[in-house]
Amino acid sequence: MNIVILAAGMGKRMYSDLPKVLHPVAGRPMLAHVLDTARALSPSRLVVVVGHGAARVREAVAADDVAFAEQAQQLGTGHAVMQALPLLDDNQPTLVLYGDVPLTSAATLQALVAEAGAQRFGVLTVEMPDPTGYGRIVRDAAGSIVRIVEQKDATEAEKAIREINTGIIVCPTGHLRKWLSTLRNDNAQGEYYLTDTVERAVADGVETVSAQPAAVWETLGVNSKLQLAEVERIHQGNQARRLLEAGVTLLDPARIDVRGELTCGRDVTIDVGCVFEGRVHLEDGVRIGAHCVIRNSTVGAGAQVHPFCHIDEAKVGPAGRIGPYARLRPGTELGEDVHIGNFVEVKNAQVAAHSKANHLAYVGDATVGSRVNIGAGTITCNYDGVNKHRTVIEDDVFIGSDTQLVAPVTVRRGATLGAGTTLTKEAPADKLTLSRAKQLTIDAWQRPVKQPKQ
């Protein structure tokens, strides 16, 4: 099967320099969602018709399995499909999709393709409570589709029809090539309508059939930021429903955003306002507090992530305690029962089991052993202005508050660093190491007093 995706429109009502099909739904361009659905049908040829912002669209979706055709002038949907004809295989039917209709399911498209087979003309239709603005499906007395009439060209009787054309069609490619060559633009829009091919099919004796989606929202197109927001909420509602049906507890299903793939074990609880990006896996018994952002990460069984944490390309071990207000940056790997507390940032560091950094610390480019206590205000000074250097902290180390570890440096097993230490050399095992300026008291000192204003 050939699949053609129309993605040439300007999207004037978006009021944006970004091509319409690149506006995101769930953090990904609408066109990327349509391509994913198209690939699920295993097409032999996949063609994207580009126009406005063609270079940006090509760059955004470039892939070995995608060919591009360019519609230099936007003269209608029929004209757009004409541009793809040289890239299509006449021996297989062609399915036409739209880059700004991101929620259509593969199951719905498979039903349409099955209904049409190899020789019939298939149209995806849906009944709308308010069909204003959509092309109407006109049927004869026997119920057969005879044509599709656009809103601006419809009579009052035709405007009363509630069954509308979604724009998604499938038909024999050889016939499509012939029908497109006969299209005219003598209509209110001055465009070449793809929908006019239905009348050509009827005239040529090609049976026209229809299929319907499981839900109306599958066929919603996006032409404005308002419609984009509506589609986003529908998609997020679908994601929330999937999680609930899988046994996840969502404290408010209307306040979760999944911008990628979220998988969960048993007895997972997610509080309000959380955002999940990329691939995220939450193991059994995980609890995620309110307003966390988690991206491309794994959270181990029984771990608790308290409110307002950011976790990016990191691994949290089983029974971990994160936050509130903690930040785990890429390359962070935490072992079992590791505690990362409020206003602690960890980057490109491996922290072994039962270690803790509970307050106000930066642990970057470090290897931290087991049962280590990192005191409040501890900083690994990893950057010399050109290169990053590593800090190694071995098992059972105790680091006092307000300590700076100037990398590269190693703290040996069982060492204790006194509060306020600036460590520039190796700290030996099982000893107290500290560096501290001599404390002075100046007896004759007086605090300055502000002079009264003149």
UniProtKB/Swiss-Prot annotation:
UDP-N-acetyl-alpha-D-glucosamine binds at residues 6-9, 20, 71, 76-77, 98-100, 135, 150, 165, 223, 329, 347, 362, 373. Mg(2+) binds at residues 100, 223. Disulfide bonds: none annotated. It holds the Pfam family Hexapep_2. Residues 247-454 are annotated as: N-acetyltransferase. It is found in: Cytoplasm. It comes from the Bacteria. It catalyses: alpha-D-glucosamine 1-phosphate + acetyl-CoA = N-acetyl-alpha-D-glucosamine 1-phosphate + CoA + H(+); N-acetyl-alpha-D-glucosamine 1-phosphate + UTP + H(+) = UDP-N-acetyl-alpha-D-glucosamine + diphosphate. Its cofactor is Mg(2+). Its main location: cytoplasm. GO terms for molecular function: glucosamine-1-phosphate N-acetyltransferase activity; magnesium ion binding; UDP-N-acetylglucosamine diphosphorylase activity. GO terms for cellular component: cytoplasm; membrane. Its EC number is 2.7.7.23, 2.3.1.157. Keywords: Acyltransferase, Cell shape, Cell wall biogenesis/degradation, Cytoplasm, Magnesium, Metal-binding, Multifunctional enzyme, Nucleotidyltransferase, Peptidoglycan synthesis, Repeat, Transferase. Residues 226-246 are annotated as: Linker. Pathway: Nucleotide-sugar biosynthesis; UDP-N-acetyl-alpha-D-glucosamine biosynthesis; N-acetyl-alpha-D-glucosamine 1-phosphate from alpha-D-glucosamine 6-phosphate (route II): step 2/2; Nucleotide-sugar biosynthesis; UDP-N-acetyl-alpha-D-glucosamine biosynthesis; UDP-N-acetyl-alpha-D-glucosamine from N-acetyl-alpha-D-glucosamine 1-phosphate: step 1/1; Bacterial outer membrane biogenesis; LPS lipid A biosynthesis. Catalyzes the last two sequential reactions in the de novo biosynthetic pathway for UDP-N-acetylglucosamine (UDP-GlcNAc). The C-terminal domain catalyzes the transfer of acetyl group from acetyl coenzyme A to glucosamine-1-phosphate (GlcN-1-P) to produce N-acetylglucosamine-1-phosphate (GlcNAc-1-P), which is converted into UDP-GlcNAc by the transfer of uridine 5-monophosphate (from uridine 5-triphosphate), a reaction catalyzed by the N-terminal domain. Homotrimer. In the N-terminal section; belongs to the N-acetylglucosamine-1-phosphate uridyltransferase family. In the C-terminal section; belongs to the transferase hexapeptide repeat family. This is Bifunctional protein GlmU. It comes from Cupriavidus taiwanensis (strain DSM 17343 / BCRC 17206 / CCUG 44338 / CIP 107171 / LMG 19424 / R1). The gene is glmU.
